[in-house]
Amino acid sequence: MTDRVTVGNLRVARALYDFITDEALAGTDLDPDSFWSGVDKVVTDLTPRNQELLARRDDLQAQIDKWHRQRAIGPHDADEYKQFLTEIGYLEPDPGDFTITTAGVDDEITTTAGPQLVVPVLNARFALNAANARWGSLYDALYGTDVISDEDGAEKGTSYNRVRGDKVIAYAREFLDGAAPLASGSYADATGFRIEDGQVQVELGDDQWVGLAGPDQFVGYTGELGSPQWSILLRNNGLHIEILIDPDSPVGSTDKAGVKDVVLESAVTTIMDFEDSVAAVDAEDKVLGYRNWLGLNRGDLSEEVSKGDKTFTRVLNPDRTYTTPDGSGELTLPGRSLLFVRNVGHLMTNDAITDAEGNEVFEGIQDALFTGLIAMHGLKESDANGPLRNSRTGSVYIVKPKMHGPAEVAYTVDLFSRVEDVLGLPQNTLKVGIMDEERRTTLNLKACIKAAADRVVFINTGFLDRTGDEIHTSMEAGPMIRKGAMKSQPWIKAYEDQNVDVGLATGFSGRAQIGKGMWAMTDLMADMVEQKIGQPKAGATTAWVPSPTAATLHAMHYHQVDVYAVHKELEGKQRASLDDLLTIPLAKELAWAPEEIREEVDNNCQSILGYVVRWIDAGVGCSKVPDIHDIALMEDRATLRISSQLLANWLRHGVITEEDVKTSLRRMAAVVDEQNAKDPDFKPMATDPDSSIAFQAAQELILAGGTQPSGYTEPILHRRRREYKASVAGA
């Protein structure tokens, strides 16, 4: 039984109450009693509206399901369908032209295009690594990944391989030629660096010194001039590059110019995630996340890290200080990524707080209140709050996921306004990032943005969740195409193009981020370097990466592409059509061979089991899960949603049977067990699937997938994780 504290109409779990009262409120000017009274009033006032919005989702879905069932025979009539969606209010009127007016936004969001990390906030080590990923070693990122091939004796091995190192150096030199070119010649021939009359000069041999083609790219240096250990700071497209020189270092001693590393400004922004990448089902889990968020904002989060036989304490990096080119002043740059926090959406409740009748309170309301409170510590430097700030403009950046349409965005805006009143913050301090990952938001994106025109700081596409909603919305329309074919569908390109077009049309360029989705293949960095440049070329000022290393590699793309120049080329264009956006990804004909159907079912069942077993048994919400071909993929609830919804759709339309699903799950459980055999804490599923809560959760996600709200996986996952935790506690 959870120990609770009575706060007006609310019953707050003791662990949460004590943390907020004793830790989160400390160092603010807020009175605890007044704060908790404000929490009570916000919950009481806004809960009915949240419930109404969820009821509206259900009502629209029921009408769409009925419409499709009535037209099960015969071809899909696109015009009739569009008219129907308009009549029921699913498609809303265009709000007309406008420009967003969000003010007080940090440069990292408004004018600096670069990578964005998303990291589970419940894991302190991951959170610290991500916050510190503002700067990353290009040499390390190249040496440790497949961007540098193993050919010609360049294998990684257990010790430094000079052949591989030379390949890294050559690659980095070529990158510098593109990002900060010399007036003549190439960095590949550099034998020395110096500063003369406030300008960088590079020796190309035989005492031939050349400057930069763009002298203004040199913005600072560290160390004493003439010292063997120093560095040069360059800037290109708003991002910084630091060339570290130390001829006595192991790498520098092998380099004819003494360069030991090239450091890139990498993860310009990071999302600390309370949503799809975490498994937070109760007060204990929520407090862990809130405490880490507090440490990040106060600047005192730390974690003991062991590597081999060494243990050290990881902390947040300080800011970086350089001498200006003429030697007369200082330039200070942020040492850490600018932090967003992603709250949960409008659907879920959490028993960290209940009302007087025992009903769980909406988790999104809790998150807004508590992450907003905690973020106050990141707005100022003081003895109580620590030496590090997050925002330098006094803003709090909250990503709000899984909103369906403008009314839900308007509700978020009103919720944030109420939170500001409770916290004593100026109106519009809490900024909102809108995830464009639900179909009704995509179709009404401009109206969604208008509802938050004075708070919005980003829009971001999320292909996997968006596909999950695409399938669920049209569950009754017929069987969908295979998962791998989704990316080639007309609605996908229209979706990605429209997000950029609408963002530009509403004034995002220079004011807010236009974001694109995650690279999920964590080990295939050569492919990422080749392909992910397409996102900035499409107008994205940021795109998601799965690791600090990936952030450094993806940062190269923003040196190769001037995104704000791309915006000028795209402004005024409307590349996406509503007809394409409304094209349902139905299979034209069921021409799959039995082995193709089995392959699709097995692929999805294996993916579901591999993710769910770690969610349920280990409380891990974001995993590097090997697929059926043993390729490591970054999985979170979004990938689970699309896999479970596709199989639920095929089950609904008779492409597969319930027995097909159960048979595949049992077969794939053995595969997942084998893939996790080296994990001493892993509990095998295949030996007794009926008693494995994780296996039963995976099966339920498919068999009951058609009836889950919007196809979301959270209700089943949360219930099953609580069941597992209770079974362990009672053992």
Curated annotation (Swiss-Prot):
Pathway(s) where this gene product acts: Carbohydrate metabolism; glyoxylate cycle; (S)-malate from isocitrate: step 2/2
Residues where Cysteine sulfenic acid (-SOH) is found: C622
Pfam families with a match to the protein in the record: MS_C, MS_N, MS_TIM-barrel, MSG_insertion
Keyword annotations: Cytoplasm, Glyoxylate bypass, Magnesium, Metal-binding, Oxidation, Transferase, Tricarboxylic acid cycle
Needed co-factor(s): Mg(2+)
EC number: 2.3.3.9
Keyword Transmembrane carried by entry: no
Molecular function per GO: magnesium ion binding; malate synthase activity
Catalytic residues identified in the record: R342 (proton acceptor), D636 (proton donor)
Major place of residence: cytoplasm
Function comment: Involved in the glycolate utilization. Catalyzes the condensation and subsequent hydrolysis of acetyl-coenzyme A (acetyl-CoA) and glyoxylate to form malate and CoA.
Protein name, per record: Malate synthase G
Gene source species: Mycobacterium sp. (strain JLS)
The organism's taxonomic lineage, starting at the top: Bacteria, Bacillati, Actinomycetota, Actinomycetes, Mycobacteriales
